[in-house]
Protein backbone atom coordinates (compact mmCIF):
# COMPACT_ATOMS: atom_id res chain seq x y z
CA UNK A 1 0.00 0.00 0.00
CA UNK A 2 1.32 3.45 -0.90
CA UNK A 3 2.03 5.77 2.03
CA UNK A 4 -0.13 8.83 2.68
CA UNK A 5 2.73 11.27 1.88
CA UNK A 6 3.31 9.52 -1.45
CA UNK A 7 -0.38 9.76 -2.34
CA UNK A 8 -0.29 13.41 -1.32
CA UNK A 9 2.64 14.03 -3.65
CA UNK A 10 0.84 12.31 -6.50
CA UNK A 11 -2.21 14.48 -5.95
CA UNK A 12 -0.09 17.58 -5.69
CA UNK A 13 1.78 16.68 -8.85
CA UNK A 14 -1.56 16.32 -10.63
CA UNK A 15 -2.46 19.84 -9.60
CA UNK A 16 0.83 21.22 -10.87
CA UNK A 17 0.64 19.43 -14.20
CA UNK A 18 -2.88 20.74 -14.63
CA UNK A 19 -1.37 24.22 -14.33
CA UNK A 20 -3.35 25.05 -11.21
CA UNK A 21 -2.67 28.53 -9.84
CA UNK A 22 -4.24 28.06 -6.40
CA UNK A 23 -2.64 30.57 -3.94
CA UNK A 24 -2.54 28.07 -1.07
CA UNK A 25 -0.68 25.57 -3.23
CA UNK A 26 1.82 28.21 -4.36
CA UNK A 27 2.47 29.24 -0.72
CA UNK A 28 3.07 25.59 0.21
CA UNK A 29 5.62 25.19 -2.57
CA UNK A 30 7.44 28.39 -1.59
CA UNK A 31 7.75 27.18 2.00
CA UNK A 32 8.97 23.71 0.94
CA UNK A 33 11.61 24.11 -1.82
CA UNK A 34 12.67 20.46 -1.51
CA UNK A 35 9.10 19.44 -2.29
CA UNK A 36 9.12 21.71 -5.33
CA UNK A 37 12.39 20.14 -6.55
CA UNK A 38 10.92 16.65 -6.18
CA UNK A 39 7.81 17.65 -8.08
CA UNK A 40 9.79 19.20 -10.89
CA UNK A 41 11.94 16.08 -11.27
CA UNK A 42 8.82 13.94 -11.48
CA UNK A 43 7.21 16.44 -13.80
CA UNK A 44 9.91 15.92 -16.44
CA UNK A 45 8.31 12.58 -17.28
CA UNK A 46 4.65 13.63 -17.21
CA UNK A 47 2.33 13.06 -20.18
CA UNK A 48 1.86 16.08 -22.44
CA UNK A 49 -1.19 18.25 -21.90
CA UNK A 50 -4.25 16.92 -23.71
CA UNK A 51 -4.87 18.53 -27.09
CA UNK A 52 -8.22 20.33 -27.14
CA UNK A 53 -10.95 19.16 -29.46
CA UNK A 54 -12.00 21.82 -31.97
CA UNK A 55 -15.60 22.31 -33.07
CA UNK A 56 -16.39 24.82 -35.82
CA UNK A 57 -20.05 25.81 -36.19
CA UNK A 58 -20.94 27.93 -39.23
CA UNK A 59 -24.32 29.52 -39.86
CA UNK A 60 -25.33 30.55 -43.38
CA UNK A 61 -26.42 34.12 -44.21
CA UNK A 62 -26.64 35.13 -40.54
CA UNK A 63 -26.24 38.84 -39.98
CA UNK A 64 -24.26 40.51 -37.24
CA UNK A 65 -27.50 41.61 -35.57
CA UNK A 66 -29.53 38.42 -35.67
CA UNK A 67 -28.72 37.03 -32.23
CA UNK A 68 -30.15 38.37 -29.00
CA UNK A 69 -26.61 38.58 -27.66
CA UNK A 70 -25.77 40.92 -30.53
CA UNK A 71 -28.75 43.16 -29.85
CA UNK A 72 -31.72 41.86 -31.82
CA UNK A 73 -34.81 43.36 -30.16
CA UNK A 74 -37.40 40.63 -30.82
CA UNK A 75 -35.48 37.39 -31.34
CA UNK A 76 -35.79 34.99 -28.42
CA UNK A 77 -32.55 34.07 -26.68
CA UNK A 78 -31.18 30.59 -27.16
CA UNK A 79 -28.18 28.41 -26.45
CA UNK A 80 -25.83 30.29 -28.80
CA UNK A 81 -26.53 33.39 -26.70
CA UNK A 82 -25.61 31.37 -23.60
CA UNK A 83 -22.29 30.54 -25.29
CA UNK A 84 -21.82 34.24 -26.00
CA UNK A 85 -22.45 35.10 -22.34
CA UNK A 86 -20.17 32.38 -20.98
CA UNK A 87 -17.52 32.62 -23.70
CA UNK A 88 -15.84 35.42 -25.61
CA UNK A 89 -18.08 37.48 -27.89
CA UNK A 90 -16.27 39.52 -30.54
CA UNK A 91 -17.68 42.75 -31.95
CA UNK A 92 -15.14 42.98 -34.78
CA UNK A 93 -15.41 39.52 -36.34
CA UNK A 94 -14.86 39.35 -40.10
CA UNK A 95 -15.06 36.86 -42.97
CA UNK A 96 -12.82 36.61 -46.02
CA UNK A 97 -15.62 37.37 -48.49
CA UNK A 98 -19.27 38.39 -48.51
CA UNK A 99 -20.50 35.45 -50.62
CA UNK A 100 -20.74 31.73 -49.78
CA UNK A 101 -18.09 29.92 -51.87
CA UNK A 102 -15.19 32.36 -51.49
CA UNK A 103 -15.95 32.88 -47.81
CA UNK A 104 -15.99 29.13 -47.14
CA UNK A 105 -12.75 28.67 -49.04
CA UNK A 106 -11.20 31.28 -46.75
CA UNK A 107 -12.56 29.52 -43.65
CA UNK A 108 -11.16 26.17 -44.79
CA UNK A 109 -7.70 27.47 -45.76
CA UNK A 110 -6.99 30.64 -43.78
CA UNK A 111 -6.28 32.48 -47.02
CA UNK A 112 -8.06 35.20 -48.98
CA UNK A 113 -10.07 33.87 -51.94
CA UNK A 114 -8.04 36.05 -54.30
CA UNK A 115 -4.98 33.91 -53.46
CA UNK A 116 -6.88 30.63 -53.84
CA UNK A 117 -8.67 31.44 -57.10
CA UNK A 118 -12.22 31.17 -55.77
CA UNK A 119 -13.46 34.01 -57.95
CA UNK A 120 -14.56 34.51 -61.54
CA UNK A 121 -17.40 35.97 -63.54
CA UNK A 122 -19.74 33.98 -61.32
CA UNK A 123 -19.46 34.37 -57.56
CA UNK A 124 -19.88 30.74 -56.41
CA UNK A 125 -19.32 27.14 -57.46
CA UNK A 126 -22.41 25.92 -59.32
CA UNK A 127 -23.45 22.26 -59.77
CA UNK A 128 -22.05 22.34 -63.31
CA UNK A 129 -18.72 23.97 -62.36
CA UNK A 130 -15.87 21.56 -63.17
CA UNK A 131 -13.49 22.97 -60.60
CA UNK A 132 -13.49 23.02 -56.81
CA UNK A 133 -11.32 23.98 -53.89
CA UNK A 134 -7.79 23.23 -55.18
CA UNK A 135 -6.15 20.17 -53.66
CA UNK A 136 -2.96 22.23 -53.40
CA UNK A 137 -4.65 24.22 -50.63
CA UNK A 138 -4.20 22.81 -47.13
CA UNK A 139 -7.55 22.71 -45.35
CA UNK A 140 -8.13 22.95 -41.64
CA UNK A 141 -9.14 19.27 -41.69
CA UNK A 142 -5.83 18.28 -43.30
CA UNK A 143 -3.87 20.41 -40.84
CA UNK A 144 -5.61 18.81 -37.88
CA UNK A 145 -5.12 15.30 -39.28
CA UNK A 146 -1.39 16.01 -39.37
CA UNK A 147 -1.67 16.92 -35.69
CA UNK A 148 -3.25 13.53 -34.93
CA UNK A 149 -6.89 14.58 -34.90
CA UNK A 150 -9.89 12.66 -36.19
CA UNK A 151 -11.80 14.91 -38.59
CA UNK A 152 -15.52 15.10 -39.33
CA UNK A 153 -17.91 17.25 -41.31
CA UNK A 154 -21.67 17.59 -41.74
CA UNK A 155 -23.83 20.18 -43.51
CA UNK A 156 -23.21 22.60 -46.34
CA UNK A 157 -20.01 22.29 -48.40
CA UNK A 158 -20.32 24.57 -51.49
CA UNK A 159 -16.69 24.13 -52.53
CA UNK A 160 -17.21 21.98 -55.61
CA UNK A 161 -18.79 18.64 -56.49
CA UNK A 162 -17.70 16.81 -59.66
CA UNK A 163 -14.97 17.31 -62.26
CA UNK A 164 -15.29 14.89 -65.17
CA UNK A 165 -18.52 12.97 -64.59
CA UNK A 166 -21.74 13.29 -62.63
CA UNK A 167 -20.52 10.82 -60.01
CA UNK A 168 -16.76 11.29 -59.54
CA UNK A 169 -17.11 13.52 -56.43
CA UNK A 170 -13.66 14.94 -57.14
CA UNK A 171 -14.17 18.04 -55.00
CA UNK A 172 -16.24 16.68 -52.13
CA UNK A 173 -15.09 17.00 -48.49
CA UNK A 174 -13.65 13.49 -48.20
CA UNK A 175 -11.00 14.60 -50.71
CA UNK A 176 -10.00 17.50 -48.45
CA UNK A 177 -9.03 15.79 -45.22
CA UNK A 178 -12.32 14.75 -43.62
CA UNK A 179 -12.29 11.17 -42.29
CA UNK A 180 -16.02 11.25 -41.61
CA UNK A 181 -18.56 13.06 -43.80
CA UNK A 182 -22.17 12.65 -42.78
CA UNK A 183 -25.25 14.12 -44.41
CA UNK A 184 -24.16 17.08 -46.48
CA UNK A 185 -25.30 19.55 -49.10
CA UNK A 186 -22.49 19.62 -51.69
CA UNK A 187 -24.05 22.71 -53.29
CA UNK A 188 -26.32 24.78 -51.05
CA UNK A 189 -29.78 25.29 -49.70
CA UNK A 190 -31.43 27.91 -51.89
CA UNK A 191 -34.66 29.55 -52.97
CA UNK A 192 -34.80 26.90 -55.72
CA UNK A 193 -34.93 24.12 -53.14
CA UNK A 194 -38.10 25.30 -51.40
CA UNK A 195 -40.39 22.31 -50.86
CA UNK A 196 -43.19 24.04 -48.94
CA UNK A 197 -44.85 25.81 -51.85
CA UNK A 198 -43.88 29.21 -50.45
CA UNK A 199 -41.44 30.15 -53.21
CA UNK A 200 -41.57 27.26 -55.67
CA UNK A 201 -44.27 24.86 -56.82
CA UNK A 202 -41.65 22.09 -56.87
CA UNK A 203 -37.97 22.16 -55.89
CA UNK A 204 -35.36 22.23 -58.65
CA UNK A 205 -33.80 18.77 -58.69
CA UNK A 206 -30.87 20.10 -60.75
CA UNK A 207 -29.71 22.22 -57.81
CA UNK A 208 -30.89 20.42 -54.70
CA UNK A 209 -29.10 17.28 -53.50
CA UNK A 210 -28.45 15.55 -50.22
CA UNK A 211 -25.36 13.35 -49.92
CA UNK A 212 -23.92 11.06 -47.27
CA UNK A 213 -20.18 11.26 -47.77
CA UNK A 214 -19.89 10.85 -51.57
CA UNK A 215 -23.22 9.07 -52.10
CA UNK A 216 -26.25 10.92 -53.42
CA UNK A 217 -29.13 9.82 -51.16
CA UNK A 218 -31.95 12.23 -52.00
CA UNK A 219 -32.70 14.49 -54.98
CA UNK A 220 -34.20 16.93 -54.22
CA UNK A 221 -34.34 16.71 -50.44
CA UNK A 222 -36.87 17.24 -47.66
CA UNK A 223 -36.16 20.32 -45.61
CA UNK A 224 -38.14 19.12 -42.64
CA UNK A 225 -35.77 17.11 -40.45
CA UNK A 226 -32.63 18.23 -42.30
CA UNK A 227 -31.11 19.99 -39.29
CA UNK A 228 -31.81 16.91 -37.19
CA UNK A 229 -29.92 14.73 -39.70
CA UNK A 230 -26.89 17.01 -39.48
CA UNK A 231 -27.11 17.11 -35.69
CA UNK A 232 -27.46 13.35 -35.27
CA UNK A 233 -24.40 12.80 -37.46
CA UNK A 234 -22.42 15.31 -35.40
CA UNK A 235 -23.46 13.59 -32.16
CA UNK A 236 -22.46 10.21 -33.55
CA UNK A 237 -19.06 11.53 -34.57
CA UNK A 238 -18.45 12.93 -31.08
CA UNK A 239 -19.53 9.67 -29.47
CA UNK A 240 -17.25 7.63 -31.72
CA UNK A 241 -14.21 9.88 -31.24
CA UNK A 242 -14.54 11.33 -27.74
CA UNK A 243 -11.54 9.39 -26.40
CA UNK A 244 -9.10 11.08 -28.80
CA UNK A 245 -8.68 14.63 -30.12
CA UNK A 246 -11.03 15.53 -32.94
CA UNK A 247 -11.97 18.39 -35.26
CA UNK A 248 -15.65 18.68 -36.16
CA UNK A 249 -17.05 21.07 -38.77
CA UNK A 250 -20.83 21.62 -38.64
CA UNK A 251 -22.05 23.87 -41.46
CA UNK A 252 -25.74 24.57 -40.96
CA UNK A 253 -28.17 25.16 -43.81
CA UNK A 254 -29.80 27.77 -41.55
CA UNK A 255 -30.24 30.75 -42.08
CA UNK A 256 -30.19 30.60 -45.90
CA UNK A 257 -33.49 30.98 -47.75
CA UNK A 258 -35.48 28.90 -48.36
CA UNK A 259 -36.23 28.95 -44.66
CA UNK A 260 -37.40 25.76 -42.99
CA UNK A 261 -37.85 24.20 -39.59
CA UNK A 262 -39.30 21.05 -38.10
CA UNK A 263 -42.76 20.95 -36.54
CA UNK A 264 -41.25 21.43 -33.08
CA UNK A 265 -40.06 24.92 -34.03
CA UNK A 266 -42.53 26.16 -36.64
CA UNK A 267 -44.72 29.01 -35.39
CA UNK A 268 -42.82 29.32 -32.10
CA UNK A 269 -40.94 32.62 -32.55
CA UNK A 270 -42.51 36.06 -32.36
CA UNK A 271 -40.05 36.98 -35.11
CA UNK A 272 -41.72 34.65 -37.60
CA UNK A 273 -40.10 32.11 -39.91
CA UNK A 274 -36.59 33.49 -39.53
CA UNK A 275 -36.90 33.29 -35.75
CA UNK A 276 -38.22 29.73 -35.95
CA UNK A 277 -35.18 28.73 -37.99
CA UNK A 278 -32.82 30.35 -35.53
CA UNK A 279 -34.46 28.61 -32.57
CA UNK A 280 -33.98 25.28 -34.33
CA UNK A 281 -30.29 26.05 -34.82
CA UNK A 282 -29.98 27.05 -31.14
CA UNK A 283 -31.39 23.64 -30.24
CA UNK A 284 -28.94 21.82 -32.53
CA UNK A 285 -25.98 23.65 -31.00
CA UNK A 286 -27.20 22.82 -27.50
CA UNK A 287 -27.45 19.13 -28.37
CA UNK A 288 -23.84 19.19 -29.60
CA UNK A 289 -22.60 20.83 -26.39
CA UNK A 290 -24.72 18.45 -24.29
CA UNK A 291 -23.01 15.52 -26.03
CA UNK A 292 -19.60 16.98 -25.16
CA UNK A 293 -20.67 17.30 -21.52
CA UNK A 294 -22.11 13.78 -21.51
CA UNK A 295 -18.68 12.48 -22.52
CA UNK A 296 -16.87 14.73 -20.00
CA UNK A 297 -14.93 16.55 -22.71
CA UNK A 298 -16.63 19.96 -22.77
CA UNK A 299 -13.77 21.55 -20.83
CA UNK A 300 -11.28 20.18 -23.33
CA UNK A 301 -13.19 21.44 -26.38
CA UNK A 302 -12.96 24.87 -27.96
CA UNK A 303 -16.00 25.88 -30.01
CA UNK A 304 -16.05 28.59 -32.67
CA UNK A 305 -19.42 29.92 -33.83
CA UNK A 306 -19.48 32.20 -36.88
CA UNK A 307 -21.51 33.03 -39.98
CA UNK A 308 -20.15 32.74 -43.52
CA UNK A 309 -21.15 36.35 -44.38
CA UNK A 310 -23.81 38.97 -43.80
CA UNK A 311 -27.56 38.78 -44.44
CA UNK A 312 -29.37 38.79 -47.78
CA UNK A 313 -31.16 42.07 -47.15
CA UNK A 314 -33.28 41.91 -50.30
CA UNK A 315 -35.17 39.03 -48.66
CA UNK A 316 -36.58 41.45 -46.04
CA UNK A 317 -37.79 39.56 -42.96
CA UNK A 318 -36.45 36.28 -44.34
CA UNK A 319 -32.99 37.68 -45.03
CA UNK A 320 -31.50 38.45 -41.63
CA UNK A 321 -30.35 41.56 -39.81
CA UNK A 322 -27.07 43.45 -40.26
CA UNK A 323 -27.70 45.49 -37.10
CA UNK A 324 -26.34 49.03 -37.44
CA UNK A 325 -24.09 48.10 -40.33
CA UNK A 326 -24.57 49.16 -43.91
CA UNK A 327 -25.04 46.60 -46.67
CA UNK A 328 -25.22 42.83 -46.51
CA UNK A 329 -24.42 39.73 -48.52
CA UNK A 330 -22.15 40.42 -51.54
CA UNK A 331 -21.20 43.92 -50.30
CA UNK A 332 -17.87 45.28 -49.12
CA UNK A 333 -19.70 47.48 -46.64
CA UNK A 334 -19.48 46.28 -43.03
CA UNK A 335 -22.84 44.51 -43.23
CA UNK A 336 -21.42 42.04 -45.74
CA UNK A 337 -18.20 41.12 -43.96
CA UNK A 338 -18.86 41.67 -40.26
CA UNK A 339 -20.42 38.67 -38.52
CA UNK A 340 -21.28 37.19 -35.12
CA UNK A 341 -18.10 35.58 -33.80
CA UNK A 342 -18.24 33.61 -30.54
CA UNK A 343 -15.56 31.41 -28.98
CA UNK A 344 -16.59 29.11 -26.14
CA UNK A 345 -14.25 27.01 -24.01
CA UNK A 346 -15.56 26.37 -20.49
CA UNK A 347 -12.93 26.67 -17.81
CA UNK A 348 -10.30 28.08 -20.16
CA UNK A 349 -11.66 31.19 -21.90
CA UNK A 350 -12.93 33.84 -19.51
CA UNK A 351 -16.37 35.26 -20.32
CA UNK A 352 -16.31 38.68 -21.87
CA UNK A 353 -16.66 40.95 -24.87
CA UNK A 354 -13.71 41.76 -27.10
CA UNK A 355 -13.40 44.60 -29.60
CA UNK A 356 -10.26 43.12 -31.15
CA UNK A 357 -10.26 42.36 -34.88
CA UNK A 358 -10.55 38.63 -35.59
CA UNK A 359 -11.36 36.82 -38.82
CA UNK A 360 -12.75 33.50 -39.98
CA UNK A 361 -9.32 32.87 -41.51
CA UNK A 362 -7.77 32.85 -38.03
CA UNK A 363 -9.48 29.61 -37.06
CA UNK A 364 -7.14 27.27 -38.94
CA UNK A 365 -4.04 28.96 -37.51
CA UNK A 366 -5.48 28.97 -33.99
CA UNK A 367 -6.56 25.33 -34.18
CA UNK A 368 -3.12 24.32 -35.46
CA UNK A 369 -1.46 26.30 -32.67
CA UNK A 370 -3.61 24.66 -30.00
CA UNK A 371 -3.15 21.25 -31.60
CA UNK A 372 0.63 21.50 -31.55
CA UNK A 373 1.25 21.68 -35.28
CA UNK A 374 2.43 24.36 -37.70
CA UNK A 375 1.15 25.51 -41.06
CA UNK A 376 3.31 25.38 -44.21
CA UNK A 377 5.70 28.25 -44.80
CA UNK A 378 5.53 28.04 -48.60
CA UNK A 379 2.45 30.28 -48.83
CA UNK A 380 1.02 33.43 -47.30
CA UNK A 381 -1.67 33.01 -44.67
CA UNK A 382 -4.05 35.89 -44.07
CA UNK A 383 -5.29 34.26 -40.88
CA UNK A 384 -3.24 34.48 -37.68
CA UNK A 385 -3.36 32.48 -34.48
CA UNK A 386 -5.55 34.30 -31.96
CA UNK A 387 -4.69 31.92 -29.12
CA UNK A 388 -3.26 34.75 -27.02
CA UNK A 389 -6.29 36.93 -27.73
CA UNK A 390 -8.51 34.13 -26.44
CA UNK A 391 -6.46 32.99 -23.46
CA UNK A 392 -4.59 36.12 -22.37
CA UNK A 393 -6.72 38.99 -23.64
CA UNK A 394 -3.87 40.12 -25.88
CA UNK A 395 -4.22 42.58 -28.73
CA UNK A 396 -5.23 41.33 -32.16
CA UNK A 397 -2.42 40.20 -34.47
CA UNK A 398 -4.19 42.12 -37.26
CA UNK A 399 -3.26 45.70 -38.03
CA UNK A 400 -5.26 45.66 -41.28
CA UNK A 401 -8.05 43.81 -43.07
CA UNK A 402 -8.74 43.65 -46.82
CA UNK A 403 -12.21 43.54 -48.37
CA UNK A 404 -12.37 41.83 -51.76
CA UNK A 405 -15.14 41.31 -54.28
CA UNK A 406 -13.95 38.65 -56.73
CA UNK A 407 -10.34 39.77 -57.34
CA UNK A 408 -11.12 43.47 -56.88
CA UNK A 409 -9.77 45.14 -53.77
CA UNK A 410 -12.80 47.17 -52.67
CA UNK A 411 -11.66 48.49 -49.29
CA UNK A 412 -9.10 48.18 -46.53
CA UNK A 413 -9.36 48.63 -42.79
CA UNK A 414 -6.29 50.01 -41.02
CA UNK A 415 -6.81 50.32 -37.30
CA UNK A 416 -10.10 52.10 -36.74
CA UNK A 417 -10.19 53.59 -40.24
CA UNK A 418 -11.70 52.04 -43.34
CA UNK A 419 -10.97 53.30 -46.85
CA UNK A 420 -13.29 52.35 -49.74
CA UNK A 421 -11.88 52.32 -53.26
CA UNK A 422 -15.18 51.07 -54.70
CA UNK A 423 -18.63 50.85 -53.16
CA UNK A 424 -21.74 48.96 -54.23
CA UNK A 425 -25.13 50.60 -54.29
CA UNK A 426 -27.05 49.93 -51.11
CA UNK A 427 -30.66 50.92 -50.59
CA UNK A 428 -32.47 51.44 -47.32
CA UNK A 429 -34.32 48.52 -45.81
CA UNK A 430 -37.56 50.41 -46.49
CA UNK A 431 -36.72 50.47 -50.20
CA UNK A 432 -35.97 46.76 -50.21
CA UNK A 433 -39.28 46.33 -48.44
CA UNK A 434 -41.10 47.70 -51.48
CA UNK A 435 -40.03 44.52 -53.28
CA UNK A 436 -41.55 42.40 -50.52
CA UNK A 437 -45.13 41.92 -49.32
CA UNK A 438 -45.69 42.07 -45.59
CA UNK A 439 -42.00 41.34 -45.13
CA UNK A 440 -42.21 38.30 -47.41
CA UNK A 441 -39.78 38.25 -50.37
CA UNK A 442 -41.40 37.97 -53.77
CA UNK A 443 -38.29 37.41 -55.87
CA UNK A 444 -34.85 35.84 -55.58
CA UNK A 445 -32.56 38.72 -56.51
CA UNK A 446 -29.71 41.06 -55.59
CA UNK A 447 -30.06 44.79 -56.10
CA UNK A 448 -26.29 45.02 -56.65
CA UNK A 449 -24.24 41.84 -56.75
CA UNK A 450 -21.47 43.32 -58.89
CA UNK A 451 -17.87 44.21 -58.16
CA UNK A 452 -17.70 46.75 -60.98
CA UNK A 453 -20.19 48.30 -63.36
CA UNK A 454 -23.25 50.52 -63.18
CA UNK A 455 -24.11 49.91 -59.53
CA UNK A 456 -20.52 50.32 -58.33
CA UNK A 457 -18.91 53.71 -57.64
CA UNK A 458 -15.15 54.25 -57.71
CA UNK A 459 -13.57 56.63 -55.21
CA UNK A 460 -10.34 58.56 -55.74
CA UNK A 461 -9.35 59.59 -53.15
CA UNK A 462 -10.84 56.70 -51.20
CA UNK A 463 -13.99 57.14 -49.15
CA UNK A 464 -12.76 57.19 -45.55
CA UNK A 465 -14.71 56.26 -42.40
CA UNK A 466 -13.87 56.09 -38.70
CA UNK A 467 -15.42 52.75 -37.73
CA UNK A 468 -15.13 53.46 -34.02
CA UNK A 469 -17.26 56.60 -34.22
CA UNK A 470 -19.25 55.69 -37.33
CA UNK A 471 -19.64 51.90 -37.63
CA UNK A 472 -22.64 52.42 -39.93
CA UNK A 473 -20.38 54.11 -42.51
CA UNK A 474 -22.71 57.08 -42.90
CA UNK A 475 -20.33 60.02 -42.52
CA UNK A 476 -17.21 60.02 -44.73
CA UNK A 477 -14.25 61.97 -43.41
CA UNK A 478 -12.68 64.87 -45.22
CA UNK A 479 -9.28 64.26 -46.75
CA UNK A 480 -8.05 67.49 -45.21
CA UNK A 481 -6.86 66.73 -41.71
CA UNK A 482 -6.44 63.01 -42.35
CA UNK A 483 -3.42 63.09 -44.62
CA UNK A 484 -1.47 60.72 -42.37
CA UNK A 485 -4.31 58.18 -42.52
CA UNK A 486 -4.36 58.27 -46.32
CA UNK A 487 -0.60 57.76 -46.40
CA UNK A 488 -0.90 54.75 -44.09
CA UNK A 489 -3.69 53.32 -46.25
CA UNK A 490 -1.58 53.81 -49.37
CA UNK A 491 1.51 52.10 -47.93
CA UNK A 492 -0.57 49.23 -46.48
CA UNK A 493 -2.18 48.54 -49.85
CA UNK A 494 1.12 48.79 -51.71
CA UNK A 495 2.76 46.30 -49.34
CA UNK A 496 -0.21 43.94 -49.68
CA UNK A 497 -0.25 44.07 -53.47
CA UNK A 498 3.51 43.62 -53.71
CA UNK A 499 3.22 40.24 -51.97
CA UNK A 500 -0.02 39.18 -53.65
CA UNK A 501 0.02 36.35 -56.17
CA UNK A 502 -3.49 35.97 -57.52
CA UNK A 503 -4.83 32.47 -57.95
CA UNK A 504 -6.14 31.22 -61.28
CA UNK A 505 -9.88 32.01 -61.51
CA UNK A 506 -11.80 28.80 -60.80
CA UNK A 507 -15.47 29.65 -61.06
CA UNK A 508 -16.08 29.85 -64.81
CA UNK A 509 -15.34 26.35 -66.15
CA UNK A 510 -18.69 24.68 -66.88
CA UNK A 511 -19.94 21.30 -68.08
CA UNK A 512 -23.62 20.45 -67.56
CA UNK A 513 -22.94 16.74 -68.01
CA UNK A 514 -21.33 16.63 -64.55
CA UNK A 515 -24.48 17.76 -62.70
CA UNK A 516 -25.48 15.07 -60.17
CA UNK A 517 -28.45 12.99 -61.27
CA UNK A 518 -29.57 9.95 -59.27
CA UNK A 519 -32.13 8.76 -61.83
CA UNK A 520 -32.15 10.30 -65.34
CA UNK A 521 -35.22 8.27 -66.30
CA UNK A 522 -37.22 9.96 -63.54
CA UNK A 523 -36.13 13.56 -64.00
CA UNK A 524 -33.28 13.17 -61.52
CA UNK A 525 -35.68 12.53 -58.65
CA UNK A 526 -35.11 9.82 -56.04
CA UNK A 527 -35.96 9.18 -52.40
CA UNK A 528 -38.17 12.24 -52.34
CA UNK A 529 -41.87 12.56 -51.56
CA UNK A 530 -43.32 15.97 -52.34
CA UNK A 531 -45.63 17.07 -49.55
CA UNK A 532 -46.13 20.81 -50.02
CA UNK A 533 -47.75 22.68 -47.23
CA UNK A 534 -47.05 25.24 -44.59
CA UNK A 535 -47.99 25.79 -40.96
CA UNK A 536 -51.12 27.85 -40.40
CA UNK A 537 -49.23 30.71 -38.82
CA UNK A 538 -47.49 31.46 -42.14
CA UNK A 539 -50.55 31.30 -44.37
CA UNK A 540 -51.77 34.89 -43.95
CA UNK A 541 -48.32 36.21 -44.81
CA UNK A 542 -48.12 33.99 -47.87
CA UNK A 543 -51.62 34.97 -48.96
CA UNK A 544 -50.61 38.64 -48.75
CA UNK A 545 -47.53 37.89 -50.82
CA UNK A 546 -49.58 36.02 -53.42
CA UNK A 547 -51.71 39.12 -54.01
CA UNK A 548 -48.57 41.12 -54.77
CA UNK A 549 -46.65 38.47 -56.67
CA UNK A 550 -45.02 39.58 -59.91
CA UNK A 551 -43.90 36.64 -62.11
From Swiss-Prot:
GO CC annotations on file: cytoplasm; extracellular region
Gene3D superfamilies under this entry?
3.30.1120.10, Alkaline Phosphatase, subunit A
Cofactor(s) it depends on: Ca(2+)
Give the top-rank taxon of the lineage listed in the UniProt record for this protein.
Eukaryota
Annotated active site residues, numbered on this chain, are 100, 158
- KW Cytoplasm (keyword) present: yes
Q: What is its main location?
A: cytoplasm
The enzyme class is hydrolase
Q: Which keywords appear in this protein's UniProt record, sorted alphabetically?
A: Calcium, Cytoplasm, Extracellular matrix, Glycoprotein, Hydrolase, Metal-binding, Secreted, Signal
Sites where a glycan is attached: 164, 213, 296
Q: How is the cofactor bound?
A: Binds 1 Ca(2+) ion per subunit.
Pfam families reported for this sequence: Sulfatase, Sulfatase_C
Q: Where in the cell is it found?
A: Cytoplasm; Secreted, Extracellular space, Extracellular matrix
* Signal peptide (UniProt feature, chain positions): 1-20
EC no. given is: 3.1.6.1
What happens to this protein after translation, modification-wise? The conversion to 3-oxoalanine (also known as C-formylglycine, FGly), of a serine or cysteine residue in prokaryotes and of a cysteine residue in eukaryotes, is critical for catalytic activity.
Report which reactions are catalysed by this protein. Answer: an aryl sulfate + H2O = a phenol + sulfate + H(+)
Binding positions (Ca(2+)): 60-61, 100, 308-309
Blocked amino end (Gln): modified positions: 21
For the modification 3-oxoalanine (Cys), the affected residues are 100
Name the Gene Ontology molecular function terms of this record. arylsulfatase activity; metal ion binding
What role does it play? Answer: May be a structural component of the extracellular matrices involved in cell movement during morphogenesis.
Q: Which family does it belong to?
A: Belongs to the sulfatase family.
Q: What is this protein called?
A: Arylsulfatase
Organism, by scientific name, is Hemicentrotus pulcherrimus (Sea urchin)
Amino acid sequence: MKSAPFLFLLGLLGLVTAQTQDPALLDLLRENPDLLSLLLQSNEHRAPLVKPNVVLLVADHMGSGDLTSYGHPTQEAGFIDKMAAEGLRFTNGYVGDAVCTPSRSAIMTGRLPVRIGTFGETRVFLPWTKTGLPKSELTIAEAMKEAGYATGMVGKWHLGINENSSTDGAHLPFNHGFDFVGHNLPFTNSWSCDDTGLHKDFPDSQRCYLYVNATLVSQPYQHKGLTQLFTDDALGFIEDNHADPFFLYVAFAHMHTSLFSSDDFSCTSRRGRYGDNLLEMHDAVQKIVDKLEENNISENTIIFFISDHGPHREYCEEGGDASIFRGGKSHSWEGGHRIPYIVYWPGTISPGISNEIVTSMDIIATAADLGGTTLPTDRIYDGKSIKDVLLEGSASPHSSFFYYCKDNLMAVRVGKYKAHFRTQRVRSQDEYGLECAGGFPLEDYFDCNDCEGDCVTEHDPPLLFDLHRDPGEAYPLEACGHEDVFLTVKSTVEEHKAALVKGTPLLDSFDHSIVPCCNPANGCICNYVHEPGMPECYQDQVATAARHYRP
